[in-house]
Amino acid sequence: MAKSRNPSLGQVSDFDIRLLRIFKTIVECGSFSAAESTLGLSRSAISLHMGDLEKRLGMRLCQRGRAGFALTDEGREVYRATQTLLAALEGFRAEVNDLHQHLRGELNIGIINNLVTLPQMRITHALSALKGQGPQVRINIGMTTPNEIELGVLDGHLHVGVVPLISPLSGLEYLPLYDEHAQLYCSRGHALFERADGDIAVDEVLAADAVAPSYRLPAEAQARHQELNNSASASDREGMAFLILTGNFIGYLPSHYAADWVAAGMLRPLLPERFHYAIALTIVTRKGRRPNLVLERFLEAVAVS
């Protein structure tokens, strides 16, 4: 599709915004077919909407076909502009909410993975309390890395995040949440599994093949991993668990995450008095953020949970 001779867009209508939301979802899902379930639309309907948007803007936004989905240069720019527009709309809605003291709008929260098994459940309880106060609030949770969560909070795409305290960024505020304790585990089938702790030497543990995380950790936790004989890596805690459960590797896991496997006799901690660490988990928000009643109520609920 060639660019229009008249590049002026004119007034942006509600229908234009709806088309842009559909476009944003397609980009984030990675393809038309992957966006079907998220949008609740058929692939043909999505294609029609994209055609309408491209005609409205006078430019080709993406390539689609047998070669797969790919944004054009113009598509990447429109996607960035769409993020800015929707964030501004949400900011406007947040300010109006503050004026009327009604909880409406969205809470976009980023969380690192495998926290749902924490026994304290402060995030779960706070989200429940928020939904009770504002039934019309839409809660959007994204599971991703600490770095992406911090960047998302900084640029306004996320209202709040839950991250380990590693290297605090100057533009963010970090509020203590709780400590997450981790121990070193092996699984049934590993050479150390059936042996009592008293019969296992520290040097044997240090020599065993281990899996290391490829994501950032606080210095103390990183030091614990580095002393092991790391011969494999994983991008997240679930990947760590996969490799430990093979019986070929030892590795650190959060105690709450490993608890069910321990109870089932599939995992055991190794010399827990020696091999353990704790990570401080925090709630992160942006400094100087605009008033947002939904976010403030969520933070209040976290504080009392």
UniProtKB/Swiss-Prot annotation:
InterPro entries: LysR_subst-bd (IPR005119), Tscrpt_reg_HTH_LysR (IPR000847), WH-like_DNA-bd_sf (IPR036388), WH_DNA-bd_sf (IPR036390). Disruption phenotype: Cells lacking this gene grow normally on putrescine, cadaverine, and GABA, but growth on beta-alanine is completely abolished. The keyword DNA-binding applies. GO terms for biological process: positive regulation of catabolic process; regulation of DNA-templated transcription. Keywords: Activator, DNA-binding, Transcription, Transcription regulation. Pfam families: HTH_1, LysR_substrate. GO terms for molecular function: DNA-binding transcription factor activity; transcription cis-regulatory region binding. Signal peptide: none annotated. The keyword Transcription applies. Residues 15-72 form the HTH lysR-type domain. Belongs to the LysR transcriptional regulatory family. PANTHER family: HTH-TYPE TRANSCRIPTIONAL ACTIVATOR BAUR, HTH-TYPE TRANSCRIPTIONAL REGULATOR. Involved in the degradation of beta-alanine. BauR activates the transcription of the bauABCD operon. This is HTH-type transcriptional activator BauR. It comes from Pseudomonas aeruginosa (strain ATCC 15692 / DSM 22644 / CIP 104116 / JCM 14847 / LMG 12228 / 1C / PRS 101 / PAO1).
